[in-house]
Amino acid sequence: MRHFLLFCLFVLVQVSAFAIPPRPDAFTLRQADGSEITVYRCGDERFGYYTTIDGLILQRGADNGLYYAEVKDGKLIATKQLAHNPQDRKAPELKLIKKLSNTAQQVDQLLSLPEHRTKMIGNNGDGLGQWGVSGFGAVSSVGKHTIPVILVSYADVELGDTITTEKISRQLNEKGYHDEPFTHGSARDYFLAMSQGLFDPTFEVVAKVKVSHGYAYYGKNSNGRNDVRVLDLVKEACNLAAEQGVDFNKYVEADKGCVPLVSIMYAGPGEANSTDSNSDDYIWPHQWTGIDYMYSGYTIGNQGVKVGAYFVGNELNEYTSGGVKKKRLAGINIFVHEFGHALGLPDGYYTGSDPSVRNRLKTMGLWDHMDIGCYLNNAATPVAFTSYERSYLGWLKLEELKEERTYALQPFDIEGRDNTAYIIRNPKN
């Protein structure tokens, strides 16, 4: 019997989408003419692109080479000029670069459109949270919750032989899990520690399935827009899990009227953190939530279950050993980052292309897991959420400093639920 799932993912009045940041380091790719170019990956899961080391915007051409890009009709498209490192550019290339001098500004304008902006609503008037009160994510950040996880192979890329439901269940739930280098606990361990026990998740690995198309079908990008068929992957994976006997009704939460979140681990690397020449066709790890949505009645089964949000993350992560690029099971950092979005946290990193803006913003960087802290130790050791993020999620009380005296800050793991953090308000902002 075919099982049915109703998705409240697809006809939305308002949605929020968040993603892991692109890897922060430059890397080298071989061009169609045999030359090598050093680039940065930029953007996010909605709008991705590359830049040269001197900040010029690049886009993939039909031959998979990197070309200087221009914005036309709100789309980022490749010109006919193959890109090179600064020292290798010839006169015609330099002439075109001068002509494209506004491209970076145009890309930043595209990224400032409403669909790329993030709004974060606190549960009180000042944008902060209240201790013991959930944030406004797809998943409530207080209490016990069970989240279904599906492992997905593509038609042309299989999950590794060691990637079993038991293995991933251990990685996500086992106390003190440490199988891979730099691992110091499971995803559940992390959330119990960050919330000091206020949030107690169980990540139930419910199925291992194989979808009907190859990775490039679902991960296809179009004019800078990423992963245009990723929802097909989510629907198909859930249908296949239901056909295997997974009853999604058991994950419905009464106060939400749906399954709050389905998590998917897909085979191979992810677009955000891979340097493979075909990595544009990988899916960029991200989380998607429907907010104030209208349900369309679209059915793909007979369980009558709605799914409120999903996130997708990659199986493998890159690392370099002895100058050789290798891949191994991704650590929990990607999972933790995307699940942070499901709890209501936005990205903390700058997605634009202007180095001066990036330097001026001075985000938390490696000190925040919702920024590039998710790349610590090859994405195996998650950095703590910031005090603001824990306050927003209802896990930490902030004490406002109003008078001059001596204050002390203790390490996070010393004080337990009495952990102290301070807030200083700027009356002019």
Can you say where each PLM-predicted feature lies in the sequence?
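Terminal low-complexity, poorly structured segments
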Residues: 1-8, 90-92, 96, 106, ...
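Bacterial Sec-dependent N-terminal signal peptides
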Residues: 1-21
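Zymogen propeptides/activation segments of proteases
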Residues: 18-299, 417-429
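Extracellular hydrolytic enzyme modules, especially secreted metalloproteases
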Residues: 261-263, 267-429
